[in-house]
Amino acid sequence: MVMQSARRRRLLVALVAFVVSAGATIMAADSSPTTPSDVPESAPLVAVSNAPQQGTEKLHIGVAYGDTLTWKSDLGLASGLDDAVALGAKWVRVDLSWRDIQPDNPKNFNWPRFDRVVKAAHERGLAVLPTIGFTPAWAQRSGCARDDSSCAPADVDKFAAFAKDAAKRYAPLGIHTWEIWNEPNIPFWAPKPDPAAYTELLKATSKAIRGADPQAYLLMGGLAAVGTDPAKGYVSHTEFLTEVAKLGGNRLVDAVAYHPYTYPYLPSAKTDFGTAFEDISSAKDNLMAVLEKYGTPGMPIWLTETGAATNGPGQASDGKTIPPNTTHVTEGFQAEIATDTVPAAAANPHVAAVFWFEDQDSGTDKDKGQRSKFYGLRRYDGTPKPAFAALRTSIAAYARQQQH
Protein backbone atom coordinates (compact mmCIF):
# COMPACT_ATOMS: atom_id res chain seq x y z
CA MET A 1 0.00 0.00 0.00
CA VAL A 2 1.20 3.49 -0.80
CA MET A 3 0.29 6.96 0.33
CA GLN A 4 1.96 8.78 -2.57
CA SER A 5 5.60 8.63 -1.42
CA ALA A 6 5.36 6.31 1.60
CA ARG A 7 5.26 2.54 1.39
CA ARG A 8 4.40 -0.17 3.84
CA ARG A 9 6.64 -3.19 4.27
CA ARG A 10 4.46 -6.24 4.84
CA LEU A 11 6.49 -9.03 6.42
CA LEU A 12 5.04 -12.45 7.11
CA VAL A 13 5.07 -13.45 10.76
CA ALA A 14 5.42 -16.72 12.64
CA LEU A 15 2.70 -19.34 12.50
CA VAL A 16 0.04 -19.38 15.20
CA ALA A 17 -2.98 -21.62 15.50
CA PHE A 18 -5.50 -19.11 14.21
CA VAL A 19 -4.71 -15.64 12.95
CA VAL A 20 -6.73 -12.78 11.65
CA SER A 21 -3.80 -10.91 10.16
CA ALA A 22 -1.07 -11.90 7.78
CA GLY A 23 0.04 -15.28 8.93
CA ALA A 24 2.90 -17.67 9.03
CA THR A 25 5.27 -18.40 6.24
CA ILE A 26 6.47 -21.85 7.24
CA MET A 27 4.41 -24.99 7.67
CA ALA A 28 5.34 -28.61 8.25
CA ALA A 29 5.86 -30.69 5.12
CA ASP A 30 3.45 -33.46 4.20
CA SER A 31 4.60 -36.95 5.08
CA SER A 32 4.73 -37.81 1.38
CA PRO A 33 5.36 -35.68 -1.71
CA THR A 34 2.40 -34.43 -3.68
CA THR A 35 2.69 -34.06 -7.42
CA PRO A 36 0.58 -31.56 -9.35
CA SER A 37 -1.31 -34.36 -11.05
CA ASP A 38 -2.43 -35.89 -7.76
CA VAL A 39 -5.99 -35.65 -6.54
CA PRO A 40 -6.12 -32.77 -4.02
CA GLU A 41 -5.59 -33.86 -0.44
CA SER A 42 -8.39 -31.61 0.75
CA ALA A 43 -12.08 -31.97 -0.01
CA PRO A 44 -13.09 -31.99 -3.70
CA LEU A 45 -12.86 -28.58 -5.33
CA VAL A 46 -15.37 -26.97 -7.66
CA ALA A 47 -14.09 -25.39 -10.86
CA VAL A 48 -14.92 -21.72 -11.41
CA SER A 49 -13.19 -20.32 -14.47
CA ASN A 50 -11.42 -17.02 -13.89
CA ALA A 51 -9.91 -16.45 -17.32
CA PRO A 52 -11.02 -13.03 -18.59
CA GLN A 53 -13.37 -13.62 -21.51
CA GLN A 54 -15.14 -11.63 -24.17
CA GLY A 55 -18.68 -10.70 -23.20
CA THR A 56 -18.05 -10.34 -19.48
CA GLU A 57 -18.68 -7.05 -17.70
CA LYS A 58 -16.07 -4.43 -18.35
CA LEU A 59 -14.56 -4.18 -14.90
CA HIS A 60 -13.56 -7.14 -12.75
CA ILE A 61 -14.06 -6.20 -9.09
CA GLY A 62 -12.44 -8.02 -6.20
CA VAL A 63 -11.04 -7.96 -2.70
CA ALA A 64 -7.31 -8.45 -2.06
CA TYR A 65 -6.55 -10.50 1.06
CA GLY A 66 -2.79 -10.99 0.92
CA ASP A 67 -1.99 -14.20 2.79
CA THR A 68 -4.59 -13.79 5.54
CA LEU A 69 -7.14 -16.29 4.20
CA THR A 70 -4.58 -19.09 4.10
CA TRP A 71 -4.07 -18.96 7.85
CA LYS A 72 -7.59 -18.26 9.08
CA SER A 73 -9.74 -20.77 10.92
CA ASP A 74 -12.54 -22.36 8.91
CA LEU A 75 -14.94 -19.85 10.44
CA GLY A 76 -12.62 -16.95 9.69
CA LEU A 77 -12.12 -18.09 6.11
CA ALA A 78 -15.85 -18.38 5.58
CA SER A 79 -16.46 -14.97 7.13
CA GLY A 80 -13.78 -13.30 5.03
CA LEU A 81 -15.09 -14.72 1.77
CA ASP A 82 -18.70 -14.03 2.73
CA ASP A 83 -17.68 -10.39 2.93
CA ALA A 84 -16.58 -10.47 -0.71
CA VAL A 85 -19.96 -11.90 -1.67
CA ALA A 86 -21.82 -9.32 0.43
CA LEU A 87 -19.86 -6.52 -1.22
CA GLY A 88 -20.80 -7.76 -4.68
CA ALA A 89 -17.20 -8.61 -5.61
CA LYS A 90 -16.59 -11.46 -8.03
CA TRP A 91 -12.86 -12.02 -7.46
CA VAL A 92 -10.48 -12.59 -4.57
CA ARG A 93 -6.73 -12.00 -4.74
CA VAL A 94 -4.76 -14.36 -2.52
CA ASP A 95 -1.04 -14.93 -2.02
CA LEU A 96 0.18 -18.31 -3.23
CA SER A 97 3.39 -18.55 -1.25
CA TRP A 98 6.16 -20.73 -2.62
CA ARG A 99 7.60 -20.73 0.91
CA ASP A 100 4.37 -22.17 2.31
CA ILE A 101 4.02 -24.85 -0.35
CA GLN A 102 7.66 -25.98 -0.46
CA PRO A 103 9.21 -24.75 2.79
CA ASP A 104 11.98 -27.33 3.03
CA ASN A 105 12.96 -28.56 -0.44
CA PRO A 106 11.76 -28.75 -4.06
CA LYS A 107 10.44 -32.30 -3.75
CA ASN A 108 7.69 -31.97 -1.12
CA PHE A 109 4.48 -30.00 -1.57
CA ASN A 110 2.02 -28.64 1.02
CA TRP A 111 -1.06 -27.80 -1.03
CA PRO A 112 -3.98 -28.37 1.41
CA ARG A 113 -4.21 -24.87 2.89
CA PHE A 114 -4.41 -23.20 -0.51
CA ASP A 115 -6.76 -25.94 -1.74
CA ARG A 116 -9.00 -24.99 1.16
CA VAL A 117 -9.08 -21.34 0.10
CA VAL A 118 -9.82 -22.26 -3.51
CA LYS A 119 -12.62 -24.61 -2.49
CA ALA A 120 -14.26 -22.06 -0.19
CA ALA A 121 -14.00 -19.31 -2.81
CA HIS A 122 -15.44 -21.45 -5.58
CA GLU A 123 -18.31 -22.61 -3.38
CA ARG A 124 -19.29 -18.94 -3.29
CA GLY A 125 -18.84 -18.36 -7.01
CA LEU A 126 -15.70 -16.27 -6.49
CA ALA A 127 -12.84 -16.40 -8.98
CA VAL A 128 -9.35 -16.63 -7.49
CA LEU A 129 -6.35 -14.54 -8.55
CA PRO A 130 -3.23 -16.09 -7.01
CA THR A 131 -0.22 -13.83 -6.49
CA ILE A 132 2.67 -16.23 -6.83
CA GLY A 133 5.92 -15.43 -5.05
CA PHE A 134 7.54 -15.53 -1.59
CA THR A 135 10.78 -17.50 -1.78
CA PRO A 136 11.59 -20.30 0.68
CA ALA A 137 14.92 -20.02 2.49
CA TRP A 138 16.43 -22.93 0.56
CA ALA A 139 15.80 -21.21 -2.80
CA GLN A 140 16.62 -17.56 -2.13
CA ARG A 141 19.54 -15.61 -3.47
CA SER A 142 22.67 -15.58 -1.32
CA GLY A 143 23.22 -12.50 0.78
CA CYS A 144 19.50 -12.07 1.49
CA ALA A 145 18.05 -12.46 4.99
CA ARG A 146 16.98 -16.06 5.58
CA ASP A 147 13.72 -15.06 7.23
CA ASP A 148 12.63 -12.73 4.41
CA SER A 149 10.33 -14.38 1.87
CA SER A 150 10.67 -11.27 -0.31
CA CYS A 151 14.16 -12.41 -1.31
CA ALA A 152 14.60 -13.01 -5.01
CA PRO A 153 15.12 -16.64 -6.02
CA ALA A 154 18.66 -17.73 -6.75
CA ASP A 155 17.44 -19.79 -9.71
CA VAL A 156 14.46 -18.51 -11.70
CA ASP A 157 13.98 -21.96 -13.22
CA LYS A 158 13.19 -23.38 -9.78
CA PHE A 159 10.57 -20.67 -9.28
CA ALA A 160 9.19 -21.39 -12.75
CA ALA A 161 8.98 -25.09 -11.93
CA PHE A 162 6.89 -24.28 -8.86
CA ALA A 163 4.66 -22.00 -10.93
CA LYS A 164 4.18 -24.78 -13.47
CA ASP A 165 3.22 -27.20 -10.69
CA ALA A 166 0.67 -24.69 -9.42
CA ALA A 167 -0.80 -24.13 -12.88
CA LYS A 168 -1.09 -27.88 -13.48
CA ARG A 169 -2.88 -28.27 -10.18
CA TYR A 170 -5.32 -25.39 -10.40
CA ALA A 171 -6.04 -24.92 -14.12
CA PRO A 172 -8.43 -27.92 -14.07
CA LEU A 173 -10.22 -26.12 -11.23
CA GLY A 174 -10.73 -22.98 -13.30
CA ILE A 175 -7.78 -20.86 -12.15
CA HIS A 176 -6.08 -19.38 -15.20
CA THR A 177 -5.16 -15.84 -14.13
CA TRP A 178 -1.85 -15.39 -12.29
CA GLU A 179 -0.01 -12.38 -10.88
CA ILE A 180 3.72 -13.04 -11.05
CA TRP A 181 5.30 -11.64 -7.88
CA ASN A 182 4.17 -8.73 -5.74
CA GLU A 183 5.63 -5.23 -6.05
CA PRO A 184 9.00 -6.10 -7.57
CA ASN A 185 9.90 -2.40 -7.85
CA ILE A 186 10.39 -2.01 -4.09
CA PRO A 187 12.18 -4.28 -1.58
CA PHE A 188 9.49 -6.93 -1.94
CA TRP A 189 12.10 -8.00 -4.46
CA ALA A 190 14.92 -8.20 -1.94
CA PRO A 191 17.57 -7.15 -1.34
CA LYS A 192 16.67 -4.46 -3.90
CA PRO A 193 14.62 -4.16 -7.10
CA ASP A 194 16.27 -5.47 -10.25
CA PRO A 195 14.29 -5.04 -13.49
CA ALA A 196 16.64 -7.29 -15.46
CA ALA A 197 16.44 -10.11 -12.92
CA TYR A 198 12.66 -9.76 -12.70
CA THR A 199 12.42 -9.96 -16.50
CA GLU A 200 14.40 -13.20 -16.43
CA LEU A 201 11.94 -14.56 -13.88
CA LEU A 202 9.06 -13.45 -16.13
CA LYS A 203 10.59 -15.24 -19.12
CA ALA A 204 10.99 -18.53 -17.31
CA THR A 205 7.69 -18.34 -15.45
CA SER A 206 5.49 -17.25 -18.34
CA LYS A 207 6.85 -20.09 -20.47
CA ALA A 208 6.29 -22.59 -17.66
CA ILE A 209 2.73 -21.52 -16.84
CA ARG A 210 1.63 -21.26 -20.47
CA GLY A 211 3.13 -24.68 -21.13
CA ALA A 212 0.99 -26.11 -18.35
CA ASP A 213 -2.14 -24.10 -19.19
CA PRO A 214 -2.75 -22.72 -22.71
CA GLN A 215 -5.59 -20.59 -21.28
CA ALA A 216 -3.28 -18.83 -18.82
CA TYR A 217 -3.68 -15.07 -18.45
CA LEU A 218 -0.61 -13.52 -16.86
CA LEU A 219 -0.16 -10.27 -14.96
CA MET A 220 3.15 -8.54 -14.43
CA GLY A 221 3.61 -8.37 -10.66
CA GLY A 222 1.68 -5.47 -9.11
CA LEU A 223 3.84 -2.37 -9.36
CA ALA A 224 3.92 -0.19 -6.26
CA ALA A 225 3.07 3.44 -7.00
CA VAL A 226 6.24 5.09 -5.68
CA GLY A 227 8.83 7.59 -6.73
CA THR A 228 12.38 6.43 -7.29
CA ASP A 229 14.27 6.64 -3.99
CA PRO A 230 17.57 4.75 -3.81
CA ALA A 231 17.77 5.24 -0.04
CA LYS A 232 14.54 3.28 0.39
CA GLY A 233 15.24 0.83 -2.41
CA TYR A 234 12.34 2.17 -4.51
CA VAL A 235 12.23 2.25 -8.30
CA SER A 236 9.24 4.18 -9.63
CA HIS A 237 6.49 2.21 -11.31
CA THR A 238 7.05 3.89 -14.66
CA GLU A 239 10.83 3.55 -14.53
CA PHE A 240 10.62 -0.11 -13.55
CA LEU A 241 8.10 -0.85 -16.30
CA THR A 242 10.30 0.97 -18.80
CA GLU A 243 13.35 -1.10 -17.90
CA VAL A 244 11.38 -4.36 -18.04
CA ALA A 245 9.80 -3.35 -21.36
CA LYS A 246 13.20 -2.53 -22.87
CA LEU A 247 14.04 -6.19 -22.29
CA GLY A 248 10.77 -7.41 -23.77
CA GLY A 249 9.11 -8.28 -20.48
CA ASN A 250 5.85 -6.56 -21.39
CA ARG A 251 5.43 -8.98 -24.30
CA LEU A 252 5.50 -11.94 -21.93
CA VAL A 253 2.33 -10.99 -20.06
CA ASP A 254 -1.28 -10.19 -20.89
CA ALA A 255 -1.71 -7.27 -18.51
CA VAL A 256 0.15 -5.12 -15.99
CA ALA A 257 -0.88 -5.17 -12.33
CA TYR A 258 -0.55 -1.88 -10.46
CA HIS A 259 -1.25 -0.62 -6.92
CA PRO A 260 -2.46 2.99 -7.11
CA TYR A 261 -3.04 4.08 -3.52
CA THR A 262 -3.96 7.75 -3.87
CA TYR A 263 -4.80 8.79 -0.33
CA PRO A 264 -4.97 11.48 0.99
CA TYR A 265 -6.55 12.21 -2.42
CA LEU A 266 -9.56 10.60 -4.04
CA PRO A 267 -8.86 8.21 -6.92
CA SER A 268 -10.76 10.55 -9.25
CA ALA A 269 -8.82 13.65 -8.16
CA LYS A 270 -7.37 15.83 -10.92
CA THR A 271 -4.04 17.35 -9.94
CA ASP A 272 -1.11 19.17 -11.47
CA PHE A 273 1.41 16.70 -10.01
CA GLY A 274 -0.21 13.39 -10.95
CA THR A 275 -1.73 11.01 -8.43
CA ALA A 276 -1.14 7.28 -8.63
CA PHE A 277 -4.43 6.94 -10.54
CA GLU A 278 -3.45 9.68 -12.98
CA ASP A 279 -0.19 7.83 -13.56
CA ILE A 280 -2.15 5.12 -15.36
CA SER A 281 -2.75 7.15 -18.49
CA SER A 282 -3.14 10.91 -17.99
CA ALA A 283 -0.07 12.11 -16.10
CA LYS A 284 2.95 13.26 -18.08
CA ASP A 285 4.84 10.12 -17.05
CA ASN A 286 2.31 7.28 -17.30
CA LEU A 287 2.12 3.53 -17.66
CA MET A 288 0.16 3.44 -20.90
CA ALA A 289 2.71 5.65 -22.62
CA VAL A 290 5.46 3.21 -21.67
CA LEU A 291 3.47 0.25 -22.95
CA GLU A 292 2.74 2.01 -26.23
CA LYS A 293 6.38 3.00 -26.71
CA TYR A 294 7.54 -0.58 -26.26
CA GLY A 295 5.07 -2.31 -28.50
CA THR A 296 2.06 -3.24 -26.39
CA PRO A 297 -0.38 -0.33 -26.79
CA GLY A 298 -3.71 -0.89 -25.10
CA MET A 299 -2.43 -3.55 -22.72
CA PRO A 300 -4.93 -3.79 -19.83
CA ILE A 301 -4.08 -2.51 -16.37
CA TRP A 302 -5.28 -4.51 -13.37
CA LEU A 303 -5.45 -2.56 -10.12
CA THR A 304 -4.78 -5.51 -7.83
CA GLU A 305 -4.50 -3.38 -4.70
CA THR A 306 -5.93 -0.03 -3.75
CA GLY A 307 -7.54 1.43 -0.65
CA ALA A 308 -6.59 3.56 2.36
CA ALA A 309 -5.33 3.03 5.91
CA THR A 310 -7.31 4.41 8.86
CA ASN A 311 -4.57 4.37 11.48
CA GLY A 312 -0.86 5.01 11.53
CA PRO A 313 1.98 6.77 13.33
CA GLY A 314 1.20 10.25 12.02
CA GLN A 315 -1.83 12.44 11.37
CA ALA A 316 -5.11 11.52 9.65
CA SER A 317 -6.52 13.42 6.69
CA ASP A 318 -10.26 13.91 6.40
CA GLY A 319 -9.97 14.76 2.71
CA LYS A 320 -10.52 18.45 3.33
CA THR A 321 -7.13 19.15 4.87
CA ILE A 322 -3.81 17.33 4.73
CA PRO A 323 -2.02 17.82 8.05
CA PRO A 324 1.76 17.68 8.31
CA ASN A 325 3.01 14.11 8.61
CA THR A 326 -0.21 12.63 7.23
CA THR A 327 0.09 8.85 7.23
CA HIS A 328 -3.53 7.73 7.00
CA VAL A 329 -7.12 8.92 6.71
CA THR A 330 -10.20 9.14 8.87
CA GLU A 331 -12.75 6.36 8.61
CA GLY A 332 -15.12 8.85 7.03
CA PHE A 333 -12.67 9.73 4.29
CA GLN A 334 -11.85 6.05 3.74
CA ALA A 335 -15.56 5.62 2.99
CA GLU A 336 -15.38 8.46 0.45
CA ILE A 337 -12.42 6.75 -1.19
CA ALA A 338 -14.35 3.46 -1.25
CA THR A 339 -17.28 5.22 -2.90
CA ASP A 340 -14.99 6.76 -5.52
CA THR A 341 -12.75 3.78 -6.34
CA VAL A 342 -15.01 1.73 -8.62
CA PRO A 343 -16.32 4.63 -10.74
CA ALA A 344 -12.80 6.06 -11.02
CA ALA A 345 -11.50 2.71 -12.24
CA ALA A 346 -14.45 2.19 -14.58
CA ALA A 347 -13.95 5.66 -16.08
CA ASN A 348 -10.50 4.71 -17.35
CA PRO A 349 -10.80 2.53 -20.48
CA HIS A 350 -7.38 1.02 -19.82
CA VAL A 351 -8.38 -0.44 -16.44
CA ALA A 352 -9.73 -3.99 -16.56
CA ALA A 353 -9.95 -4.82 -12.85
CA VAL A 354 -9.87 -3.24 -9.41
CA PHE A 355 -9.30 -4.94 -6.05
CA TRP A 356 -9.79 -3.30 -2.65
CA PHE A 357 -7.10 -4.07 -0.07
CA GLU A 358 -8.21 -5.38 2.36
CA ASP A 359 -11.11 -7.04 4.21
CA GLN A 360 -10.20 -6.61 7.89
CA ASP A 361 -7.65 -4.81 10.05
CA SER A 362 -5.00 -7.00 11.64
CA GLY A 363 -4.06 -4.58 14.43
CA THR A 364 -5.46 -2.46 17.24
CA ASP A 365 -4.48 1.04 18.33
CA LYS A 366 -1.34 -0.28 20.04
CA ASP A 367 -0.11 -1.31 16.57
CA LYS A 368 -0.57 2.08 14.92
CA GLY A 369 3.13 2.28 14.20
CA GLN A 370 2.40 -0.32 11.51
CA ARG A 371 0.05 1.39 9.11
CA SER A 372 -0.17 -1.77 6.99
CA LYS A 373 -2.48 -3.30 9.61
CA PHE A 374 -5.30 -0.79 9.09
CA TYR A 375 -6.48 -0.95 5.48
CA GLY A 376 -9.48 -3.13 6.30
CA LEU A 377 -13.13 -2.55 5.58
CA ARG A 378 -13.64 -4.01 9.05
CA ARG A 379 -11.89 -3.19 12.29
CA TYR A 380 -9.86 -5.78 14.17
CA ASP A 381 -12.91 -6.73 16.25
CA GLY A 382 -14.91 -7.45 13.10
CA THR A 383 -17.18 -4.43 13.21
CA PRO A 384 -17.60 -2.76 9.82
CA LYS A 385 -16.12 0.63 9.08
CA PRO A 386 -18.26 3.04 7.02
CA ALA A 387 -16.17 2.03 3.99
CA PHE A 388 -17.77 -1.42 3.92
CA ALA A 389 -21.24 -0.09 3.15
CA ALA A 390 -19.77 2.58 0.88
CA LEU A 391 -17.94 0.07 -1.29
CA ARG A 392 -20.93 -2.26 -1.38
CA THR A 393 -23.16 0.58 -2.56
CA SER A 394 -20.63 1.65 -5.17
CA ILE A 395 -20.27 -1.87 -6.58
CA ALA A 396 -24.06 -2.25 -6.72
CA ALA A 397 -24.38 1.04 -8.59
CA TYR A 398 -21.79 -0.10 -11.12
CA ALA A 399 -23.58 -3.43 -11.58
CA ARG A 400 -26.85 -1.62 -12.27
CA GLN A 401 -25.14 0.54 -14.89
CA GLN A 402 -23.88 -2.57 -16.64
CA GLN A 403 -27.42 -3.89 -16.95
CA HIS A 404 -28.55 -0.94 -19.06
Model-identified regions with their sequence ranges:
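Boundary/entry segment of secreted carbohydrate-active catalytic domains
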Residues: T35-K90, D95-S97
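Substrate-binding cleft and catalytic face of glycoside hydrolase catalytic domains
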Residues: L87-G233, R251, Y263, P297
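Aromatic-rich peripheral "rim/lid" segments of glycoside hydrolase catalytic domains that contact
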Residues: V2-A6, V46-A47, A139, P313, ...
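Short, acidic/polar
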Residues: T70-V85, F159-A167, Y234-K246, A335-A344
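Noncatalytic carbohydrate-binding groove/subsite architecture in carbohydrate-active enzymes
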Residues: Q54, V156, A160, P195-E331
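Secretory targeting and sorting signals
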Residues: S5-S31
